Amino acid sequence: MYKDIKKSIAELLVLPISNERKETLSALVAYVQHKVTADLDVNINFICTHNSRRSHLSQIWAQVAASYYNIPRVFCCSGGTEATALYPKVVDTLVNTGFVIDKLSEADNPIYIIKYADSVMPIVGFSKTYDHLFNPKRGFAAVMTCVQADGGCPFVAGAEKRIPIIFEDPKVSDGTPEQTKVYSQRSSQIASEMFYVFSMIKTNRC
């Protein structure tokens, strides 16, 4: 894992998480633990309206957290109720945290290769609907990261568990002097909570 990401992780691991928030996260902890105990793949699809901000941050930080805690066979993805584009400020925020990100195209919906270590497969980031071919079709947890998707998408085909974990939208800061700070704070919150989830998982290894 890259040095700058390790430094960022050390900082976010000490961020406080309220008991109320831990209760919200408990359903995801239970889902992951069940899969790990049964020696099954852990497929998690983080869903928001546009798959541009919160769902990508959740996907990426959850994958990093699983790697950090050596939780096997975790496959995180993300999607929206509609496709737009991965918002550039999210990319900037991740780069500032220590990720190495390559942009593969200049299309309206670019594809990004997101790396946090040389020894693992990179994360592929681009906006897509939650049922895109890139995502699992069945046997996954659908984690709803925004109120709009949670309310507007009551049924997610193929999901075996639906888990609402709502994050505030950093979009409210777009076009303001506070944008960088707000995106950094939201990324750190999401990272902290995903690291909490995977820190709670007990593996079958001795």
Residue ranges and their predicted role:
Residues 2-206:
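Short polar/charged helix/loop
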